[in-house]
Amino acid sequence: MSHSVEDIKSESRRLRGSLEQSLADAVTGALREDDQTLIKYHGSYQQDDRDIRDERRQQKLEPAYQFMIRTRTPGGVITPAQWLALDGIATRYANHSLRITTRQAFQFHGVIKRELKATMQAINATLIDTLAACGDVNRNVQVAANPLLSQAHATLYADAACVSEHLLPNTRAYYEIWLDEERVSGSGNEDEPIYGDRYLPRKFKIGFAAPPLNDVDVFANDLGFIAILRDGRLLGYNVSIGGGMGASHGDAQTWPRVANVIGFVTRDQLLDIATAVVTTQRDFGNRAVRKRARFKYTIDDHGLDTIVAEIARRAGFALQPAQPFAFEHNGDRYGWVEGEDGLWHLTLSLPAGRIADTDTATHLSGLRAIAQLNVGEFRMTPNQNLVIAGVPASERARVDALVAQYALDAGNRSASALARGAMACVALPTCGLAMAEAERYLPDFSAALQPLLQQHGLADTPIVLRLSGCPNGCSRPYLAEIALVGKAPGRYNLMLGGDRRGQRLNTLYRENITEPEILAALEPLLARYAAERDHANDEGFGDFLHRAGLIALPSYPTHRRLDLELLA
């Protein structure tokens, strides 16, 4: 018998439930129904292979249950030793691949139940965990991966890691179930000062951005911290609240939202403001209607001024006025760049973040070889790419030799700038919410679009493309200049008009259409863009569509164009 998510949380004995009994049940590859909810807080989702679901049903077999495991890696920074260990885990327990998420975490796919605990223990042995990587808690904290700002990145990373640790659940359930920690008196009744016994109404996302780069898409986060840098010195952070991508097809009560900038805080105020924002959502969020439970709806339902006043009351101080800042783009810089500290950083484009050895790529082997050099560190970017960071000039030649040997820079040499910067969620065959393909379709769609780009001289023009298998928007499609949002197998909603800076939502342009219809809809728009764009100001595709009157801002009830780019 299943229960409501709120009941499952409150009766779980601080996220324990009957997980240990579910794991021990050898009769099925699945967990008990309520435990399928609880395991999310431990960093895993129960899934099945949808490609063979019908076949197994015909054979009177249960679905091919498997588990996705997601790491908690604030800012996506790991050492070469950790990389090698995670590579080994993927090879031994998962489907021989690693996947970089849009929130700078790793996902392992294809882990079966009887190996779930061993996999969790192996991950923790690397000094990485999976606690709170999923569930109605604060998720993995994003950090700008800007390799040019070496000192700023180090400071942002330290602040983000501090916030991540501060907002972890206090329960010992994770350590008891997966790491065999001895139970003590009071086990199952630990105090949760931030989350309480029902945790948050829905998931919560935090990002740290470093202008002029908005690679984290900070305005898609529930809570954003925008670094204010002057002469290389970090003064503090502008605070943004209320971003979120998820929506439901055909439901006018749901919509994506860009965040509001509400003020400025100093570094020593970070934890107080983060706690105030999270607990405000905990107490004001909608627990009766789950699809309306995200913080963006809390703000829209109660009013921005009311929520900001409550945050200030809980923090014990009013935020200072927001400081000037400006974003230039939300993509990655590919190739080598030298940081302020004289170390070098190589950004590699990895299509949809998938790292595997296939018929056409040897990314897993190649990055293993680079990790074995034991130089620098690895940084996952919010665009699902990878930075080999902190490389001394004397080691560049060795890295370059391996990059060439394994063709790791093939993505950097993609036929179009659009393909290099495109993102996609996993979707089929493992995501239970997917309505259409995304990751597996991205190469084909990019290739289908390529002739149009070449025809109009746009192959080298950066256009933000994102694919999502469903309207929940894990690939942040609603901020893209071109987005496909899955509606049914082979059919998508075509969304147009976001911008390169991650500051404007796009708009539904055509609904429930196939690839030929998508290409037919895009061709005249790309033709006009090529002929009429403002070259002098490097006008983006989304900006052109609005200037030319070819598309309007979305008509979401609370959406308005926010003046986010303050004069620096």
Curated annotation (Swiss-Prot):
Q: Name one Pfam family in it.
A: NIR_SIR_ferr
Please write the reaction equations for the catalytic activity of this protein.
Answer: hydrogen sulfide + 3 NADP(+) + 3 H2O = sulfite + 3 NADPH + 4 H(+)
**Per its Swiss-Prot or TrEMBL entry, what cofactor is needed?**
siroheme; [4Fe-4S] cluster
* InterPro entries in UniProt: CysI (IPR011786), NiRdtase/SiRdtase_haem-b_fer (IPR005117), Nit/Sulf_reduc_fer-like_dom_sf (IPR036136), NO2/SO3_Rdtase_4Fe4S_dom (IPR006067), NO2/SO3_Rdtase_4Fe4S_prot (IPR045169), NO2/SO3_Rdtase_4Fe4S_sf (IPR045854), NO2/SO3_Rdtase_FeS/sirohaem_BS (IPR006066)
Q: Which domain of life is it from?
A: Bacteria
Q: What does the entry list as the binding residues for [4Fe-4S] cluster?
A: 425, 431, 470, 474
Q: What is the top EC class of this enzyme, as a single word?
A: oxidoreductase
Pathway stated in the Swiss-Prot or TrEMBL entry: Sulfur metabolism; hydrogen sulfide biosynthesis; hydrogen sulfide from sulfite (NADPH route): step 1/1
Q: What happens when the gene is disrupted?
A: Cells lacking this gene display a blocked APS- (adenosine-5'-phosphosulfate) or PAPS- (3'-phosphoadenosine-5'-phosphosulfate) dependent cysteine synthesis but do retain AvrXa21 activity.
| Family matches, as PROSITE patterns | NIR_SIR
Quote the record's cofactor note.
Answer: Binds 1 siroheme per subunit.
- Per the UniProt entry, what are the Gene Ontology biological process annotations, in alphabetical order? cysteine biosynthetic process; hydrogen sulfide biosynthetic process; sulfate assimilation
Per UniProt, the keywords (alphabetical) are:
4Fe-4S, Amino-acid biosynthesis, Cysteine biosynthesis, Heme, Iron, Iron-sulfur, Metal-binding, NADP, Oxidoreductase
Reported EC number(s) for this entry are 1.8.1.2
Q: Which GO terms describe its cellular component?
A: sulfite reductase complex (NADPH)
Question: Tell me, what is one Gene Ontology molecular-function annotation carried by this entry?
Answer: heme binding
Binding of siroheme occurs at: 474
Similarity section: Belongs to the nitrite and sulfite reductase 4Fe-4S domain family.
What role does it play?
Component of the sulfite reductase complex that catalyzes the 6-electron reduction of sulfite to sulfide. This is one of several activities required for the biosynthesis of L-cysteine from sulfate.
> What is the protein's quaternary organization?
Alpha(8)-beta(8). The alpha component is a flavoprotein, the beta component is a hemoprotein.
What is the protein name stated in its UniProt record?
Sulfite reductase [NADPH] hemoprotein beta-component
**Which species is this UniProt entry from?**
Xanthomonas oryzae pv. oryzae (strain KACC10331 / KXO85)
List the gene name: cysI
